[in-house]
Amino acid sequence: DFSTDNTISEVESYSSKNSKLVLLKHKNNQGVGGAIATGYLWARDNDIDVAVVMAGDAQMDPFDLPDILDPVVEGQADYSKGNRLFSGEAYKKIPKVRYFGNSILSLLTKIASGYWHIADSQTGYTAINSKALKLVDWDKMYRRYGQPNDLLVMLNVLNMRVKDIQINPVYSVGEKSGIKIHKVIFSISWLLLKRFLWRLKEKYIIRDFHPLVFFYFLGFLFGIATVILFSRVFYYWIVLGSDIPSINALAAMFSFMSSSLFTLFAMWFDMEANKALK
């Protein structure tokens, strides 16, 4: 992760005393996603039963580890992840900018991934079993800040069970996030849009056809029609200052209602199709 706190030398000093401690390192910085992918590949190739991601930034409480592990070890889930938002105190502990960005991305990730029961999509405190390790194509996983979001989409296509686990949000007092919220939200939103379309194609067309793709498609078409028709309404009203043709107003409202209903039904069908993956 391109850390500058002598992490490598510290790990090497301890690995000489403990043969179970294995250090994996990159010659070039590959981002957080690249580091996680390398670790997962090593775990897969060495027949590890459960692989856990715990960052070295002291923001993941080790006391939460048993709770993260239990669902995977007991066979209740293929992938478990921490959720800092379960706590009613989360908004007080998490930096405001990060909390706001996380909330937006969590909503978008629900839609893109099909895991409607999960939240706190940006947490990296996770556990994954050997079945999922062997099925996921780690070479295709996103390598940057959107890695957790991308992985959830890939797991959904593979019908892996995912469980959210309450964890304690750990942040230093007065800590300020270095994340540029506008860049992160737009870049990951674009990633989620692409992965959402990929999931619809892969899961509901190629692997097993589901009519919800028609509902999403019609919702999209009526959405475009809504924009065009309302633009014409505002053109008559604001630019020309004339009366709005009643047929135009009715068509705009019809398109808006149709787009909303088709999209909401598509989401509902998606939720029903994935409810067994909790």
Predicted regions and their residues:
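A conserved acidic beta->alpha catalytic loop
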Residues: 1-9
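Short beta-to-alpha linker loops that shape the active-site pocket of alpha/beta-hydrolase fold enzymes
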Residues: 2, 85, 168
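Acidic metal-phosphate-binding loop of nucleotide-sugar-dependent transferases
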Residues: 4, 30, 58-59
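Short, conserved SAM-binding/catalytic segment
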Residues: 14-18
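Acceptor/aglycone-binding surface of glycosyltransferases and processive sugar-polymer synthases
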Residues: 21-45, 50, 62-145, 171-186
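Hydrophobic helical membrane-anchoring modules
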Residues: 140-278
